[in-house]
Protein backbone atom coordinates (compact mmCIF):
# COMPACT_ATOMS: atom_id res chain seq x y z
CA UNK A 1 0.00 0.00 0.00
CA UNK A 2 2.86 2.38 0.73
CA UNK A 3 4.12 1.82 -2.81
CA UNK A 4 0.76 2.86 -4.19
CA UNK A 5 0.66 5.90 -1.93
CA UNK A 6 4.16 6.95 -2.86
CA UNK A 7 3.35 6.74 -6.56
CA UNK A 8 -0.11 8.23 -6.48
CA UNK A 9 -0.23 10.36 -3.33
CA UNK A 10 -2.81 10.13 -0.58
CA UNK A 11 -5.92 8.04 -1.31
CA UNK A 12 -8.19 11.08 -1.30
CA UNK A 13 -6.03 12.68 -3.98
CA UNK A 14 -6.41 9.80 -6.45
CA UNK A 15 -7.88 10.82 -9.79
CA UNK A 16 -10.16 8.63 -11.90
CA UNK A 17 -7.14 7.84 -14.09
CA UNK A 18 -5.17 6.72 -11.03
CA UNK A 19 -8.10 4.59 -9.85
CA UNK A 20 -8.25 2.90 -13.25
CA UNK A 21 -4.49 2.32 -13.25
CA UNK A 22 -4.71 0.70 -9.80
CA UNK A 23 -7.64 -1.48 -10.90
CA UNK A 24 -5.81 -2.59 -14.05
CA UNK A 25 -2.63 -3.31 -12.07
CA UNK A 26 -4.58 -5.52 -9.64
CA UNK A 27 -6.25 -7.29 -12.56
CA UNK A 28 -2.89 -7.99 -14.24
CA UNK A 29 -1.30 -9.23 -11.02
CA UNK A 30 -4.10 -11.73 -10.45
CA UNK A 31 -4.34 -13.12 -13.99
CA UNK A 32 -0.85 -13.69 -15.40
CA UNK A 33 -0.48 -17.47 -15.35
CA UNK A 34 -0.07 -20.44 -17.70
CA UNK A 35 -2.49 -23.05 -19.09
CA UNK A 36 -3.13 -25.21 -22.17
CA UNK A 37 -5.35 -23.60 -24.79
CA UNK A 38 -6.60 -26.09 -27.38
CA UNK A 39 -9.56 -28.43 -26.85
CA UNK A 40 -7.85 -31.30 -28.66
CA UNK A 41 -5.12 -32.07 -31.15
CA UNK A 42 -7.45 -31.89 -34.15
CA UNK A 43 -8.70 -28.40 -33.25
CA UNK A 44 -5.09 -27.30 -32.77
CA UNK A 45 -3.96 -28.64 -36.13
CA UNK A 46 -6.87 -27.12 -38.06
CA UNK A 47 -6.46 -23.70 -36.46
CA UNK A 48 -2.66 -23.67 -36.73
CA UNK A 49 -2.64 -24.67 -40.41
CA UNK A 50 -5.28 -22.08 -41.27
CA UNK A 51 -3.67 -19.24 -39.33
CA UNK A 52 -0.15 -20.16 -40.44
CA UNK A 53 -1.11 -19.47 -44.05
CA UNK A 54 -2.60 -16.11 -43.03
CA UNK A 55 0.48 -15.17 -40.98
CA UNK A 56 3.02 -16.07 -43.68
CA UNK A 57 3.24 -12.53 -45.14
CA UNK A 58 4.50 -11.33 -41.75
CA UNK A 59 6.56 -14.32 -40.52
CA UNK A 60 8.39 -16.24 -43.26
CA UNK A 61 9.70 -19.23 -41.29
CA UNK A 62 7.06 -21.95 -40.82
CA UNK A 63 8.40 -23.11 -37.44
CA UNK A 64 8.52 -19.54 -36.13
CA UNK A 65 4.93 -18.99 -37.33
CA UNK A 66 3.62 -22.10 -35.59
CA UNK A 67 5.40 -21.29 -32.34
CA UNK A 68 4.08 -17.72 -32.39
CA UNK A 69 0.56 -18.93 -33.18
CA UNK A 70 0.67 -21.38 -30.25
CA UNK A 71 1.78 -18.56 -27.97
CA UNK A 72 -0.95 -16.22 -29.24
CA UNK A 73 -3.64 -18.88 -28.90
CA UNK A 74 -2.56 -19.72 -25.36
CA UNK A 75 -2.42 -16.10 -24.16
CA UNK A 76 -5.71 -15.21 -25.87
CA UNK A 77 -7.46 -18.27 -24.45
CA UNK A 78 -6.25 -17.58 -20.92
CA UNK A 79 -7.60 -14.05 -21.29
CA UNK A 80 -10.93 -15.21 -22.74
CA UNK A 81 -10.22 -13.44 -26.04
CA UNK A 82 -10.57 -14.80 -29.54
CA UNK A 83 -7.09 -15.44 -30.91
CA UNK A 84 -8.13 -13.87 -34.21
CA UNK A 85 -8.85 -10.56 -32.46
CA UNK A 86 -5.41 -10.70 -30.85
CA UNK A 87 -3.85 -11.40 -34.26
CA UNK A 88 -5.60 -8.31 -35.67
CA UNK A 89 -4.38 -6.17 -32.76
CA UNK A 90 -0.81 -7.40 -33.27
CA UNK A 91 -0.97 -6.70 -37.01
CA UNK A 92 -2.00 -3.10 -36.31
CA UNK A 93 0.30 -2.56 -33.31
CA UNK A 94 3.58 -4.04 -34.54
CA UNK A 95 3.08 -5.95 -37.81
CA UNK A 96 4.37 -8.96 -35.81
CA UNK A 97 7.72 -7.34 -35.01
CA UNK A 98 8.54 -8.39 -31.46
CA UNK A 99 11.22 -5.69 -31.26
CA UNK A 100 8.88 -2.86 -32.31
CA UNK A 101 9.01 0.25 -30.13
CA UNK A 102 6.50 3.08 -30.51
CA UNK A 103 7.23 6.79 -30.22
CA UNK A 104 5.62 6.61 -26.76
CA UNK A 105 7.94 3.75 -25.75
CA UNK A 106 5.47 0.85 -26.01
CA UNK A 107 7.25 -2.42 -26.78
CA UNK A 108 6.80 -5.74 -28.50
CA UNK A 109 4.08 -7.48 -30.44
CA UNK A 110 1.16 -5.88 -28.58
CA UNK A 111 2.97 -2.61 -27.82
CA UNK A 112 2.84 -2.79 -24.03
CA UNK A 113 4.03 0.23 -22.07
CA UNK A 114 7.06 -0.67 -19.90
CA UNK A 115 5.69 1.02 -16.76
CA UNK A 116 3.35 -1.97 -16.30
CA UNK A 117 6.33 -4.13 -15.28
CA UNK A 118 6.93 -1.91 -12.24
CA UNK A 119 3.23 -1.45 -11.58
CA UNK A 120 2.65 -5.17 -11.08
CA UNK A 121 5.94 -5.86 -9.35
CA UNK A 122 7.70 -7.64 -12.21
CA UNK A 123 10.44 -5.17 -13.21
CA UNK A 124 12.60 -7.90 -14.73
CA UNK A 125 10.03 -8.93 -17.35
CA UNK A 126 11.28 -8.48 -20.91
CA UNK A 127 8.50 -7.13 -23.12
CA UNK A 128 10.26 -8.29 -26.29
CA UNK A 129 9.80 -11.90 -25.19
CA UNK A 130 6.67 -13.00 -27.03
CA UNK A 131 5.05 -14.93 -24.19
CA UNK A 132 5.54 -12.07 -21.74
CA UNK A 133 4.30 -9.41 -24.15
CA UNK A 134 1.29 -11.48 -25.17
CA UNK A 135 0.34 -12.18 -21.56
CA UNK A 136 0.46 -8.49 -20.65
CA UNK A 137 -1.26 -7.33 -23.84
CA UNK A 138 -4.04 -9.91 -23.74
CA UNK A 139 -4.76 -9.28 -20.06
CA UNK A 140 -4.86 -5.53 -20.64
CA UNK A 141 -7.30 -6.00 -23.54
CA UNK A 142 -9.36 -8.42 -21.41
CA UNK A 143 -9.57 -5.76 -18.71
CA UNK A 144 -10.84 -3.12 -21.14
CA UNK A 145 -13.39 -5.50 -22.67
CA UNK A 146 -14.76 -6.26 -19.21
CA UNK A 147 -14.77 -2.59 -18.27
CA UNK A 148 -16.63 -1.69 -21.47
CA UNK A 149 -19.10 -4.58 -21.09
CA UNK A 150 -17.81 -6.26 -24.26
CA UNK A 151 -18.02 -3.18 -26.50
CA UNK A 152 -15.11 -3.82 -28.87
CA UNK A 153 -14.68 -0.29 -30.22
CA UNK A 154 -14.56 1.26 -26.74
CA UNK A 155 -12.35 -1.52 -25.34
CA UNK A 156 -9.86 -1.19 -28.19
CA UNK A 157 -9.83 2.60 -27.78
CA UNK A 158 -9.03 2.08 -24.09
CA UNK A 159 -6.28 -0.41 -24.95
CA UNK A 160 -4.76 2.08 -27.38
CA UNK A 161 -5.17 5.08 -25.11
CA UNK A 162 -7.47 6.78 -27.60
CA UNK A 163 -10.76 6.72 -25.68
CA UNK A 164 -13.58 8.42 -27.52
CA UNK A 165 -12.08 7.78 -30.96
CA UNK A 166 -12.79 4.92 -33.36
CA UNK A 167 -9.72 5.43 -35.55
CA UNK A 168 -7.67 2.70 -33.84
CA UNK A 169 -10.54 0.26 -33.40
CA UNK A 170 -11.52 0.70 -37.05
CA UNK A 171 -7.93 -0.23 -38.04
CA UNK A 172 -8.16 -3.39 -35.93
CA UNK A 173 -11.58 -4.19 -37.40
CA UNK A 174 -10.20 -3.80 -40.95
CA UNK A 175 -7.26 -6.11 -40.16
CA UNK A 176 -9.62 -8.64 -38.57
CA UNK A 177 -12.05 -8.51 -41.51
CA UNK A 178 -9.33 -8.62 -44.17
CA UNK A 179 -7.10 -11.34 -42.75
CA UNK A 180 -8.02 -12.85 -39.38
CA UNK A 181 -11.81 -13.18 -39.34
CA UNK A 182 -12.79 -16.28 -37.43
CA UNK A 183 -15.50 -16.56 -34.80
CA UNK A 184 -18.13 -13.81 -35.12
CA UNK A 185 -17.42 -10.63 -33.15
CA UNK A 186 -19.91 -7.89 -32.36
CA UNK A 187 -18.44 -4.72 -33.86
CA UNK A 188 -21.66 -2.71 -33.39
CA UNK A 189 -20.55 -1.11 -30.09
Task: List each model region and its residues.
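Boundary at the C-terminal end of the N-terminal hydrophobic targeting segment
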Residues: 9, 13-16
Amino acid sequence: MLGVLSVFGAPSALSAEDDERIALRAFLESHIEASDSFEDRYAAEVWLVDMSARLEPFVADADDRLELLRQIHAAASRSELTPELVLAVIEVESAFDRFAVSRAGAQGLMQVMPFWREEIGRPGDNLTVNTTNLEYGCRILQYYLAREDGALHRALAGYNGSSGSRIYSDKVKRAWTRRWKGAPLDWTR
